[in-house]
Amino acid sequence: MNRLGFVFQSAPHSTSKGREGLDAILAASAYSEDIQIFFIGDGVLQLLKNQEPEKILSRDYISGFKMLELYDLEEIFVCQNAMGNRGIKEEYLLIDVDSISNKDINEKLSQCDQIMVF
């Protein structure tokens, strides 16, 4: 089976990319167990706790990231540099992740057979 990589690089709620990415992951997990998920750039903002999207009339899909564990999706990586540049610490995040360097992210992405970017 092919290794699938999902990359989140967009801020939440400004577009539908985050919600569509989460939906794509959950759908793909029915067919593949070899899935890696990456949060880079503004994509790290997708995982922040205590977001209130209803205040800007957006749908709350962020809590859906908690479902990744139920789907046995454990290879979830965030970019250390992106978190540092935005003053984000791991305890601010909604789910457990592995914080890794840009180099490690690039290495892992190079091992994916298919990559989808959101």
Swiss-Prot record:
Predominant place of localization: cytoplasm
Keywords from the named record: Cytoplasm
Any one annotated GO CC term: cytoplasm
InterPro entries assigned to the protein according to its UniProt record, in alphabetical order: DsrEFH-like (IPR027396), Sulphur_relay_DsrE/F-like (IPR003787), Sulphur_relay_TusC/DsrF (IPR017462)
UniProt xrefs under SUPFAM superfamilies: DsrEFH-like
Any single Pfam family the record assigns to this protein: DsrE
Localization of this protein: Cytoplasm
Domain of life from the UniProt record: Bacteria
Function: Could be part of a sulfur-relay system.
Family membership: Belongs to the DsrF/TusC family.
Name the record gives this protein: Protein TusC homolog
Classification of source organism: Bacteria, Pseudomonadati, Pseudomonadota, Gammaproteobacteria, Vibrionales
Gene symbol of the encoding locus: tusC
